[in-house]
Amino acid sequence: MSLHDSSGESVDARNLFTETAKLLMDGNIIAVKGIGGIHLASLATRDDVLEKFRRRKDRKNQPYALMSPDMDSIRSYALMNPVEEAHIQGWKRPVVLLRKRHRVISELVAPGLDTVGVMLPYTGIQTMLFKRFDEPALVMTSGNRRGLPMAITNEAAFSELGGLADYFLLHNREIINRSDDSVLRVIRGKPAFTRRSRGYVPDPINISISKGIGFAFGAELRNAAAIGTNGKVFMTQYLGDITSLEGVESEEKAIQAMRDLLNITCNPDVIACDLHPDYMTSQMAEVMSQEMDVPLVRSQHHHAHITSVMAENDIKNEEVLGIALDGAGYGEDGQIWGGEVLKSTYSGYKRVGQLEYVPMPGGDLCAYYPYRMLISSLTKQLSDDEIRDITGNHIDSALPHGPQERDIILNHARRKDILQTSSSGRFLDSISALIGLSYNRTYEGEPAMLLEALASRGTPDSVNFSPEIVNKGGKYILNTSNVLKYLIDKDNRYKKEDVAAFGQ
């Protein structure tokens, strides 16, 4: 083991753990090499340290995971039920999302949220480090630059994390397979994964419908690939966003590592990818399909969500009614889906319900600036002048270019050739913007997560309104723009937490 400063020079210390603990207590950020990658660690109790950390990592509000030395330390700042305790203490050592308790840790660990992700030490280095000081928790987050996978080599630690970390606590053991920490929350007594990775991979998921060998490349964001064989699906570790060359190389390596582990030397019988033609994962699948002369199956995003749940629950090839709610997925009609009711079998589906289509002026900009989505939705209910009047008091803080940007949005939203979305994520963003909770998304899902935290203190039945559902040609459509108009008409009648709970 070795300890280095930001220039890469070795730090002469009698005891590396004692010295590292002292550096942490002084407010330094330390890169700590583990077994699946390199973490960035800091104190979790000082606002000034967290402010510095966020500036360097360019993560304004995204929640950080915490590592605590023992269960009593966790109980000092979080609430746990017996099932959550069992997962935290289990040998797989995931990050478990828990309800916040007293403000022992800095609010800047997870700003605006009512939960915090917590894990116990799972390596000797982490255990020895906690023996050297008396802190309830350390921030322990993935060591990576934005858009890049987590660093796993000592060389990458210095080249990629230089400027982020003040010191580097490293060892000479090679990390073969990058593996982020797994993240889960307990819902109705069962674990629901936000990220399935270290500790859970390569445990297979048993399914009874699998025939032959299949490779699946997944979507582009929050990716994991998979190999199906002999009635089992072996998912790769969490790979993050596949939007860079480094991300592509990471997925290629993960698939090959899984093939080697399973001793699969032959070509697969089929290759699957998302329906979206521009995803880098789809293009990777196309190339492999052509090189191996293997059929390529393009799966609609939300149909894949539903059939994966069917497979996990051992539902045979029977028709089910599935609901898929998320931020975005490429639809068969070229629009952006995300609030879907699909009558599904494994081989096909019929779209029988959806959220109302709403224009997306500026495309993905709507996901980063929720007020864009709110304005666009209101064009289906109100005139431009009415929208200008409603948004007048907030527009300068809600949009980077204020009234001028609003007028461009209004103009584009009424064009017939504009991209449309039925996304539940964008609808929740609109409510978040409406009650002034989030105007600028700094990480994926932030407006909806803030809304969820606020909703935990509200009562949904306090909002006396039943959303309109209309039948158009055998398809049921929930009118989301009318919900927003109603909430505006009842301005200040309802508490924000009740509106948030109603929207959820």
Show which residues each predicted segment covers:
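Active-site-adjacent structural elements in enzyme catalytic cores
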Residues: 1-272, 276-291
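Cap/lid and interdomain-hinge subdomains that line or gate substrate/regulatory clefts
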Residues: 1-3, 98-103, 109-110, 117-126, ...
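Short, hydrophobic/aliphatic alpha-helical segments
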Residues: 13-29, 128-135, 312-324, 403-418
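Generic recognition of stable, solvent-exposed alpha-helical segments in well-folded globular domains
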Residues: 15, 48, 69, 124, ...
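A contiguous, well-structured pocket-lining segment that forms one wall/lid of small-molecule binding clefts
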Residues: 219-257, 379-504
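Conserved phosphate-binding/catalytic loops in two-lobed NTP-binding clefts
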Residues: 274, 293-305
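Active-site histidine-anchored catalytic micro-motif
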Residues: 310, 315-379, 413-414, 420-422, ...
